[in-house]
Amino acid sequence: FITLLLRKFICSITKKC
C-alpha cells in the first residue's frame, strides 16, 4: 500500500501535515 506517498501528496497540497 502507498499510504505514505498519498499522505505526502495531500500534505503538499493542503499544507497540513
From Swiss-Prot:
Q: What's the stated role of this polypeptide? A: Antibacterial activity against representative Gram-negative and Gram-positive bacteria and exhibits a very high hemolytic activity.
Q: Could you give a single Gene Ontology term from the biological process aspect?
A: killing of cells of another organism
- Native source organism of the sequence: Rana temporaria (European common frog)
- Report keywords, A-Z: Amphibian defense peptide, Antibiotic, Antimicrobial, Cytolysis, Disulfide bond, Hemolysis, Secreted
Name of the protein in question: Brevinin-1Ta
Q: Which ranges does the record mark as transmembrane?
A: none
Annotated localization: Secreted
- Similarity field: Belongs to the frog skin active peptide (FSAP) family. Brevinin subfamily.
Q: Which cysteine residues pair off into disulfide bonds?
A: C11-C17
GO CC, alphabetical = extracellular region
Question: According to its UniProt record, in which tissues is this protein expressed?
Answer: Expressed by the skin glands.
The answer to keyword Disulfide bond applying to this record is yes
